[in-house]
Regions:
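A short, surface-exposed beta-strand/turn
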Residues: 95-105
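C-terminal partner/receptor-binding element of secreted or periplasmic proteins
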Residues: 119-169
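Short, solvent-exposed aromatic-acidic interface loops
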Residues: 86, 110-117
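N-terminal secretory signal peptides
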Residues: 26-96
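Bacterial N-terminal signal peptides
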Residues: 10-21
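Short hydrophobic/aromatic-rich beta-strand segments that constitute the beta-sheet cores
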Residues: 81, 106-110
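N-terminal secretory signal peptides that target proteins for export/translocation
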Residues: 1-7
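Secreted/processed peptides and extracellular or luminal domains of membrane proteins
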Residues: 29, 40, 107, 151-154
């Protein structure tokens, strides 16, 4: 039996199936009494030490994360980090985020101002990294390095190794 569809339609159908399966598997594995631990303040970051990663081939933005900002909480399973999105003109958007690998969710804790100080995001909530209305960098970072299926990677060292060697698996 042959099945044909427009490439864009097929890719969206496949994305929906994969995202739905992964999301349902992750939700089932999350404890009902889960509670996020106290969020550490935004860490310092160094623009000269960013490890870049590709989000989409068509994106004009360059995304990078500072490995010194990485933390993996053993109590709540959250991977926290500072991500920097840079435009072709050099403008930067610096964000302090957390990834919840067990549910495929992301939360923005703070954004950096041009002077380097942080502004806490009021009423920040966990949102699906698969939500197509959100920027894709969190999902790509989770898949490329931060999460191993529905769990965070074992260590910051492992996270850095995966970012530096994306094809080694």
């Amino acid at each position: 039996m042959n099945f044909a569809c427009a490439p864009r339609v097929c890719s969206w159908l496949l994305f929906g199936l994969l995202a739905g399966n992964l999301a349902s598997a992750q939700i089932l594995s999350d404890p009902a009494d889960w509670k996020e631990s106290d969020v550490p303040p935004p860490p310092a970051y160094d623009m000269s030490k960013l490890l870049t990663f590709e989000v989409t081939r068509s994106s004009p933005l360059v995304y990078g994360v500072d490995p010194a900002s990485f933390s993996i909480s053993k109590t709540d399973g959250i991977v926290r980090y500072v991500v920097v999105a840079t435009t072709p003109a050099g403008a930067k958007n610096v964000i302090y985020e957390g990834l919840r690998c067990s549910t495929g969710e992301v939360r923005t804790y703070a954004r950096a101002k041009p002077d380097g100080s942080w502004v806490t995001v009021a009423n920040s909530e966990w949102k699906s990294a698969y939500d197509i209305s959100l920027p894709r960098h969190s999902l790509r970072f989770a898949k490329a390095a931060a999460c191993l299926q529905a769990a965070p990677v074992s260590s910051v060292r492992e996270l850095i190794r995966k970012l530096k060697n994306p094809s080694v698996e």
